[in-house]
């Protein structure tokens, strides 16, 4: 008689770290309860990303996202998804110093059911990561292409193309791991250095536009499901023509209304 493993009720950091070199971590973004509930049984990690400022609020970058905004959407995601490990982005300016970072990270933990917070930056953030973890906050690091630095960088630029950048990325990864980061997001870095970092550090790496050798992958759900056709990053694979499917359904609905075919007798009360 074979023993069946009981389904995991809630994915924890320990579960994710146990996947290192064993099984790929599946991650996706979500910003509301509806989609979080749909994604719940299919993914390990849901990121409530400040990317919502672009994909949800139609802004040019993530910089105007606020703590209030992130709390609102994190609460919604936590209401819809019960099993995945839920990470909340710390928005631009919310961790500019230790006092501010502690205040906002603790607020996230008190007001939502988020599993962890994510912040951008390399070894210069190591002391802050250590301070947060000492207070019981799980921190996810984020290095490489960092959207909160897009104006400083002059655009969305791939990192790791030269030896100097590769050395810095590895130093950043090792420093964040030593400081206590539980996971590390690698965004927009060349495949060889992403592979090196993944091999050198003991915590899992989750890649976005950083090659297949990371311990897991994440995509913005609206990119992956084909809801934006104005611009598609090279690293995005569309698994659905979502915009086209929804528009066709709305056209059919509008046509039925105009022709008097909706509602019909079965859809009406008497």
UniProtKB/Swiss-Prot annotation:
Binding site for 3-methyl-2-oxobutanoate: 50-51, 89, 118
Cofactor requirements of the protein: Mg(2+)
Family annotation (InterPro entries): Pantoate_hydroxy_MeTrfase, Pyrv/PenolPyrv_kinase-like_dom, Pyrv_kinase-like_dom_sf
Active site: 187
UniProt key word Metal-binding: yes
Catalytic activity, reaction form: 3-methyl-2-oxobutanoate + (6R)-5,10-methylene-5,6,7,8-tetrahydrofolate + H2O = 2-dehydropantoate + (6S)-5,6,7,8-tetrahydrofolate
Top-level EC class as recorded in UniProt: transferase
GO biological process: pantothenate biosynthetic process
Predominant location: cytoplasm
GO molecular function annotation: 3-methyl-2-oxobutanoate hydroxymethyltransferase activity; magnesium ion binding
Binding site for Mg(2+): 50, 89, 120
Subcellular location: Cytoplasm
Entry-linked CDD domains: KPHMT-like
EC number per UniProt: 2.1.2.11
Pathway: Cofactor biosynthesis; (R)-pantothenate biosynthesis; (R)-pantoate from 3-methyl-2-oxobutanoate: step 1/2
The organism's place on the tree of life at top rank: Bacteria
Keywords: Cytoplasm, Magnesium, Metal-binding, Pantothenate biosynthesis, Transferase
Cofactor annotation remark: Binds 1 Mg(2+) ion per subunit.
GO (cellular component) term, any one: cytoplasm
Function summary: Catalyzes the reversible reaction in which hydroxymethyl group from 5,10-methylenetetrahydrofolate is transferred onto alpha-ketoisovalerate to form ketopantoate.
Family indicated by similarity: Belongs to the PanB family.
Subunit record text: Homodecamer; pentamer of dimers.
Listed PANTHER family: 3-METHYL-2-OXOBUTANOATE HYDROXYMETHYLTRANSFERASE
Protein name in UniProt: 3-methyl-2-oxobutanoate hydroxymethyltransferase
Organism: Helicobacter pylori (strain HPAG1)
Lineage: Bacteria, Pseudomonadati, Campylobacterota, Epsilonproteobacteria, Campylobacterales
């Amino acid at each position: 008689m074979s023993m069946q493993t009981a389904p995991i009720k809630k994915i924890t950091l320990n579960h994710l770290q146990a996947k290192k070199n064993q099984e790929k971590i599946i991650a996706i973004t979500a910003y509301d309860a509806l989609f979080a509930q749909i994604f719940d049984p299919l993914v390990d990690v849901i990121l409530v990303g400040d990317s919502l400022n672009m994909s949800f609020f139609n802004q040019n970058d993530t910089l105007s996202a606020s703590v209030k905004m992130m709390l609102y959407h994190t609460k919604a995601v936590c209401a819809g998804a019960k099993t995945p490990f839920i990470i909340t982005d710390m928005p631009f300016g919310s961790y500019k110093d230790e006092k501010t970072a502690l205040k906002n990270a603790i607020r996230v933990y008190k007001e939502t059911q988020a599993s962890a917070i994510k912040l951008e930056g390399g070894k210069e953030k190591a002391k802050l990561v250590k301070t947060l973890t000492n207070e019981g906050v799980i921190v996810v690091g984020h290095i490489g292409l960092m959207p909160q630095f897009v104006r400083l960088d002059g655009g969305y630029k791939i990192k790791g193309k030269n030896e100097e950048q590769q050395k810095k990325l590895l130093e950043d990864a090792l420093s964040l791991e030593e400081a206590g980061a539980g996971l590390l997001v690698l965004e927009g870095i060349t495949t060889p250095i992403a592979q090196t970092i993944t091999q050198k550090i003991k915590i899992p790496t989750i890649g976005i536009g950083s090659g297949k050798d990371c311990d897991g992958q994440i995509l913005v759900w609206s990119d992956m499901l084909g809801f934006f056709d104005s611009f598609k990053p090279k690293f995005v694979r569309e698994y659905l023509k979502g915009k086209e499917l929804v528009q066709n359904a709305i056209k059919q609905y509008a046509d039925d209304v105009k022709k008097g075919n909706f509602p019909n007798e079965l859809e009406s009360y008497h």
